């Protein structure tokens, strides 16, 4: 026999009787890595494969040389008095052992390096040890002793082994032949344990839980193996957890067979090495070893992950919902987790007195709490990608990690676990009268008690009463893989409450929750913390206020004596998790340092306020500005991240290429880009928009479109009636309500069927009304036929439109800046306001006020006047009909007209303000505000109808589809003249007014299209500037043949139409602005609105009841509301305001006050010039004067003001308005006339 000693390879080897010290040369060598991957998931099925293989493996390598390390290891392992591990185990915790097979190939230990430094454990070498230990189970066993009893020693299992191990216990094992094993004498020290070895082998013949375990003929080869496959993480246990007297399931540092050959000191050393985790003293580093893959390639196998390897957890960041729970006492003085705050984007706190949610606000944190949080994260437990599916499983792992990291004592494990599993309550629970949402830990345990794997009895659960003074009680948490989730009994399910549904609407669909648990407990001597990121987000029952899957958990417990504010630290981590950059870093973190780096980045962009008393909110204005600068700096730093963190190009070549691609994409999407070919822009519009033609009708199948039809109908009908009545007054009923309604209907239908942007609403506007009045005055003063002149203007309009579209002249709209738009809008608003009071003064002149008199003559005159009024009001046609003189000098007419005008204005204006108020729910406010003008008209008509003895002038509307004045005109206008031949020179000279009309239509239509097509509105189907302009102008030219008015894109009505079809996202965090989800870009709503406006001719009897004074009130309303959003109007206010009261806006902060006032004075001068032109006989040329402001701004103003000042004073800062801000609506979005 060879004298070379041999160290025991595994516990399976040492369970045998002494064997020969030398092996035959013919024994095949042990392949080191052949079964490495499979043995990582070593289970019952795998053992059956191994045990059924023929032949034995092992043997020493030929020529194996032994060094001093091997001799020292042999001396330490076999030349001492050893006590079998079974002496430390309770009688009921024994289990059958597996005999030893032939020796395996000796291998050099990865011992200390020659330099004396701590060696590094190679994972491949760890795996080879495990493979070698498993090979020992293939040895021929010894016959068992029938006198032994079955044992129940269990070992720590991986989660995947639980099911396999249970299946082994419940299935019988087929018998196999027991080959003969040769025995050999051993050394004297080894002989002392011979009896114990035989006893252990005899004990190993039993089965775990079977009655026939002691049968003499029971083969040993099917015994439950004592070996298990483990990973390095499962060694992380302290030595106190391995004491058999303190654990229900004994924990041993190694296999029993190997343990019996080791002394007590060796076992203690092994326990300390494998289980304890002493802070500051770490064991060998574990690094990846490529030996396994190279060995697999050498043997012809495909290298790949082992079956035990799990895929990397998905780290894609999601939206976040954070809930802060604090440990508090309920009304029964029982501890519970009480929700005190939540974060969707901003912080919402629960008011203590009223138990309701406060207003969302930006969280303000103390600097010390952030530093304390960073310190606790640096020293606390951090568990990333924890693979648990239930709260008890998570709590168990957290508590074990706290014990391992020496944050809590072992005896505090039960108390901390009990605290983690306390009941969770929320402010909304008390408002619900259905089944309680929270299930206590005890009731949950009673529900789960009927679903144990054994079916009869179960191990202790965390839900059973925990006695803090009994440290030997082991707490078992059922793993989800071992137990199916218990089905809830009938009656425990409930529907979501209104509060939950409302809150879920504000949370994004893919959001994942963060649960923050903080509180004071007196059984701890120092604070303990744990930060957990689950491998997959799971819904934890009765934890959150709403059913949102949980991905992160943060726990902070400690005594009240600690110098630490747990509430503020909880708010700090909650605010950090609600921060976009930090929670993205938390998703992508691989270790603790990544979290600490993210906290430092958060601190770099935080604002610290000095501890000084703030007397007013205006002192904090600079904070918001400073914060915006910090955020801008943070975004710029984010662009400089290394590759992989973003897609930002780094090289100059990549940046240039990206810039070229962006420019090319922007140019391709720009509808105003010139192609250089005749009608090139028109062709591009058709190719861009018409492919979506069928979808324009399919997208209208939505209830929101039906609501928009009703709303836009009244929004379009009210201006048609108002402008129609005023146009009839200006043109002596040559063009009135009926013509305007018919023109709106016909042109609206055609445009919705053929237009490129069907969201535009075609209608009459104030600038066109001003031009119609000026042209009518011009024709009347020159004895020309007004309607015939309009026909020739229409002819020239068509030619001008064709020429403009052929030359792709729509790009000229870019040169119409805010400077010109505001002058134009301000002029039209002044005209509206002026005309309103001018008409009212005229009524007072026609119907003067009378003093009180008691004379009979006065009474007689009054009676005659009343009789005259009565005959007038009772006549079939109203007083304004053609062929009748309006009555004059009627009593109380002027006062009633004033009341009707003022009442209409104030009701419409108040309802507009009411839309953005805080009364009633938002939906009701929006309905009332959107229908403010029709409601005001209806109320004032009822007031006028109820006053029967006072005359008021009514709207002139014919019966049926007839022109307003049938005795003056018909439906078709003769271009050569109706009553007298039209002069030829005027046919040619009509080109000049045609140019002026074209300027007005061009500006209104193209600027409105620009506003609708802003990128903030997220339109997908595109617009068509050239096609829309050609359609609108061509339809106006054709309609002039029928005596119908010209129309243009109405700015306010178009923006209102687009807003009505905009779908806002419901998942809006409290305090955040809503975002556009989609826009229903379709043609049906505009088509139906146009048809309904045309059918409004059938309600002529109702329209004839509308007093003109009511229309004057609407006129005043449009003039006043049009001033909102005009920066010129706001800067006029600043002329009378001290600089210290100026608002905090760009053109005030970036431009000196005198320079700003100079710019305002220049705009005021241009406005005065336009007003002077309007007041003279040359009023027809006001569009030409208006267009001259464009070169004035481009040539003159650029010489007076710097480029920076012009950008501040003439920038278009208006953004689409979708949310409900007080005093803000569609009128604030555009500096264009109504």
Curated annotation (Swiss-Prot):
The chain crosses the membrane at residues 705-728, 734-771, 791-813, 823-843, 894-911, 927-947, 981-1003, 1029-1050, 1084-1129, 1156-1192. Residues 1-239, 287-315, 446-467 are annotated as: Disordered. Expressed in the parotid and submandibular glands (at protein level). Expressed in the gastric mucosa (at protein level). Expressed in the choroid plexus epithelium (at protein level). Expressed in the liver and gallbladder. GO terms for biological process: amelogenesis; bicarbonate transport; chloride transport; digestive tract development; negative regulation of CD8-positive, alpha-beta T cell differentiation; negative regulation of CD8-positive, alpha-beta T cell proliferation; osteoclast differentiation; positive regulation of enamel mineralization. Residues 207-216 have a biased composition (Gly residues). Residues 76-85, 94-110 have a biased composition (Basic residues). Inhibited by 4,4'-diisothiocyanatostilbene-2,2'-disulfonic acid (DIDS). The modification Phosphoserine is found at residues 113, 145, 171, 173, 240, 440. The modification N6-methyllysine is found at residue 271. GO terms for cellular component: apical plasma membrane; basolateral plasma membrane; membrane; plasma membrane. GO terms for molecular function: chloride transmembrane transporter activity; chloride:bicarbonate antiporter activity; enzyme binding. Pfam families: Band_3_cyto (PF07565), HCO3_cotransp (PF00955). It comes from the Eukaryota. Residues 705-1234 are annotated as: Membrane (anion exchange). It catalyses: hydrogencarbonate(in) + chloride(out) = hydrogencarbonate(out) + chloride(in). A lipid is attached at residue 1166 (S-palmitoyl cysteine). Keywords: Anion exchange, Antiport, Cell membrane, Glycoprotein, Ion transport, Lipoprotein, Membrane, Methylation, Palmitate, Phosphoprotein, Transmembrane, Transmembrane helix, Transport. Residues 120-133 have a biased composition (Acidic residues). PROSITE patterns: ANION_EXCHANGER_1, ANION_EXCHANGER_2. Sodium-independent anion exchanger which mediates the electroneutral exchange of chloride for bicarbonate ions across the cell membrane. Plays an important role in osteoclast differentiation and function. Regulates bone resorption and calpain-dependent actin cytoskeleton organization in osteoclasts via anion exchange-dependent control of pH. Essential for intracellular pH regulation in CD8(+) T-cells upon CD3 stimulation, modulating CD8(+) T-cell responses. NCBIfam families: ae (TIGR00834). Belongs to the anion exchanger (TC 2.A.31) family. This is Anion exchange protein 2. It comes from Rattus norvegicus.
């Amino acid at each position: 026999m060879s004298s070379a000693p041999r160290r025991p390879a595994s516990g399976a080897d040492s369970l045998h009787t002494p064997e020969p010290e030398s092996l035959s040369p013919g024994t095949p060598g042990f392949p080191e890595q052949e079964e490495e991957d499979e043995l990582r998931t070593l289970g019952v099925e795998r053992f059956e494969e191994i045990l059924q293989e023929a032949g034995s493996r092992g043997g020493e390598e030929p020529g194996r040389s032994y060094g001093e390390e091997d001799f020292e290891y042999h001396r330490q392992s076999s030349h001492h008095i050893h006590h079998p591990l079974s002496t430390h185990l309770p009688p009921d915790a024994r289990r059958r052992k597996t005999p030893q097979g032939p020796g395996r190939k000796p291998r050099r230990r990865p011992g200390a390096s020659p330099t004396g430094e701590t060696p590094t454990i190679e994972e491949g070498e760890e795996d080879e040890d495990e493979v070698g230990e498993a090979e020992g189970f293939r040895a021929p066993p010894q016959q068992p002793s029938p006198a032994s009893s079955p044992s129940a020693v269990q070992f720590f299992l991986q989660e995947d082994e639980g099911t396999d191990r249970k299946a082994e216990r419940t299935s019988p094992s087929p018998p196999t032949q027991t080959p003969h094993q040769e025995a050999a004498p051993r050394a004297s020290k080894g002989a002392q344990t011979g009896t114990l070895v035989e006893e252990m082998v005899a004990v190993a013949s039993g089965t775990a839980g079977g009655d026939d375990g002691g049968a003499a003929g029971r083969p040993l080869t099917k015994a439950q193996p004592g070996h298990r496959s483990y990973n390095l993480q499962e060694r992380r246990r302290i030595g106190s957890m391995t004491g058999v007297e303190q654990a229900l399931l004994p924990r041993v540092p190694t296999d029993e067979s190997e343990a019996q050959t080791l002394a007590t000191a060796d076992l203690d050393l092994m326990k300390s090495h494998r289980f304890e985790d002493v802070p500051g003293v770490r064991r060998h580093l574990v690094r990846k070893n490529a030996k396994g893959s190279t060995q697999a390639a050498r043997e012809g196998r495909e290298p790949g992950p082992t079956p035990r390897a799990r895929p990397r957890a998905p780290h894609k960041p999601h939206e976040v919902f954070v809930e802060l729970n604090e440990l508090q006492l309920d009304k029964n003085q029982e501890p519970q987790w009480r929700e005190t705050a939540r974060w969707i984007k901003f912080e919402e706190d629960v008011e203590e007195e009223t138990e309701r949610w406060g207003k969302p606000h930006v969280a303000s944190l103390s600097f010390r709490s952030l530093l304390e949080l960073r310190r606790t994260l640096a020293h606390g437990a951090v568990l990333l990608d924890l693979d648990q599916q239930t709260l008890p499983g998570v709590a168990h792992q957290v508590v074990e990690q706290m014990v391992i990291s020496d944050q809590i004592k072992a005896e505090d494990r039960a108390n901390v676990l009990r605290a983690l599993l306390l009941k969770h309550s929320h402010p909304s629970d008390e408002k619900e009268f259905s089944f309680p949402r929270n299930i206590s830990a005890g009731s949950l345990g009673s529900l789960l008690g009927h679903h144990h794997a054994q079916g009869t009895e179960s191990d202790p659960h965390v839900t059973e009463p925990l006695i803090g003074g009994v440290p030997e009680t082991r707490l078992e948490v059922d793993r989800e893989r071992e137990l199916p989730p218990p089905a809830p009994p009938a009656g425990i399910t409930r529907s979501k409450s209104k509060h939950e549904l409302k809150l879920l609407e504000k949370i994004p669909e893919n959001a994942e929750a963060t649960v923050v648990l903080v509180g004071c407990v007196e059984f701890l001597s120092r604070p303990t913390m744990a930060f957990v990121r689950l491998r997959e987000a799971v819904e934890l029952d009765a934890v959150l206020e709403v059913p949102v899957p949980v991905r992160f958990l943060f726990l902070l417990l400690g005594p009240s004596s600690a110098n630490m504010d747990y509430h503020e630290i909880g708010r700090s981590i909650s605010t950090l998790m609600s921060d976009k950059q930090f929670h993205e870093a938390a998703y992508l973190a691989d270790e603790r340092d990544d979290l600490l780096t993210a906290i430092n980045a958060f601190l770099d962009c935080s604002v610290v306020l000095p501890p000084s008393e703030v007397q007013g909110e205006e002192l904090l204005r600079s904070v918001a500005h400073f914060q915006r600068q910090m955020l801008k700096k943070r975004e710029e730093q984010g662009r400089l991240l290394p590759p992989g963190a973003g897609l930002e190009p780094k090289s100059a070549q990549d940046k240039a290429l990206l810039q070229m691609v962006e420019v090319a994409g922007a140019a391709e999407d720009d509808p105003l880009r010139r192609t250089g070919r005749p009608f090139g822009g028109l062709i591009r519009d058709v190719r861009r928009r018409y492919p979506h033609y069928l979808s324009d009708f399919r997208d209208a199948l939505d209830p929101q479109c039906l609501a928009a039809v009703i709303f836009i109908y009244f929004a379009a009908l009210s201006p048609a009636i108002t402008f129609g009545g005023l146009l009839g007054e200006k043109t002596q009923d040559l063009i009135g309500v009926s013509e305007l309604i018919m023109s709106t209907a016909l042109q609206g239908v055609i445009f919705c069927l053929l237009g490129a942007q069907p969201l535009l609403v075609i209608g009459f506007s104030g600038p066109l009304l001003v031009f119609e009045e000026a042209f009518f005055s011009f024709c009347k003063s020159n004895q020309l036929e007004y309607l015939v002149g309009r026909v020739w203007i229409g002819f020239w309009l068509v030619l001008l439109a064709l020429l403009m579209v052929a030359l792709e002249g729509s790009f000229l709209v870019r040169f119409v800046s805010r400077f010109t738009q505001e002058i134009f809008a301000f002029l039209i608003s002044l005209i509206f306001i002026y005309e309103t009071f001018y008409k009212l003064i005229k009524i007072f002149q026609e119907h003067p006020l009378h003093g009180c008199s008691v004379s009979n003559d006065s009474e007689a005159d009054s009676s005659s006047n009343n009789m005259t009024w009565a005959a007038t009001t009772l006549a079939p046609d109203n007083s304004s009909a053609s062929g009748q003189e309006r009555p004059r000098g009627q009593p109380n007419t002027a006062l009633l007209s004033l009341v009707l005008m003022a009442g209409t204005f104030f009701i419409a204006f108040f309802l507009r303000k009411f839309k953005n108020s805080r009364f009633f729910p938002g939906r009701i406010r929006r309905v009332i505000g959107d229908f403010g003008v029709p409601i005001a008209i209806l109320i004032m008509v009822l007031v006028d109808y109820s006053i029967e003895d006072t005359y008021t002038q009514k709207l002139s509307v014919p019966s049926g589809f007839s022109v307003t004045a049938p005795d003056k005109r018909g439906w078709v206008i003769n271009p050569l003249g109706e009553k007298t031949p039209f002069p030829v020179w005027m046919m040619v000279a009509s080109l000049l007014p045609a140019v002026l009309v074209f300027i007005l239509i061009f500006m209104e239509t193209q600027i409105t299209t620009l506003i609708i097509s802003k990128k903030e509105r997220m339109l997908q189907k595109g617009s068509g500037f050239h096609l829309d302009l050609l359609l609108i102008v061509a339809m106006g030219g054709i309609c002039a043949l029928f005596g119908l008015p010209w129309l243009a894109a109405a700015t306010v009505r178009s923006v209102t139409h687009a807003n009505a079809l905009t779908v806002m996202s419901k998942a809006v965090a409290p305090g955040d602005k809503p975002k556009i989800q989609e826009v229903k870009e379709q043609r049906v709503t505009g088509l139906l609105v146009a048809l309904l406006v045309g059918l409004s001719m059938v309600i002529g009897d109702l329209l004839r009841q509308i007093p003109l004074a009511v229309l004057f009130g609407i006129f005043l309303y449009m003039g006043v509301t049009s001033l909102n959003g005009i920066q010129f109007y706001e800067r006029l206010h600043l002329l009378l305001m001290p600089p210290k009261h100026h608002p905090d806006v760009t053109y005030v902060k970036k431009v000196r006050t005198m320079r700003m006032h100079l710019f305002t004075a220049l705009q005021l001068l241009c406005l005065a010039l336009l007003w002077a032109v309007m007041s003279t006989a040359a009023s027809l040329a006001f569009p030409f004067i208006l267009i001259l402001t464009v070169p004035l701004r481009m040539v003159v103003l650029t010489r007076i003001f710097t480029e920076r000042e012009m950008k501040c004073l003439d920038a278009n800062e208006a953004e689409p308005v979708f949310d409900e801000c007080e005093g803000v609506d569609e009128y604030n979005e555009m500096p264009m006339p109504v």
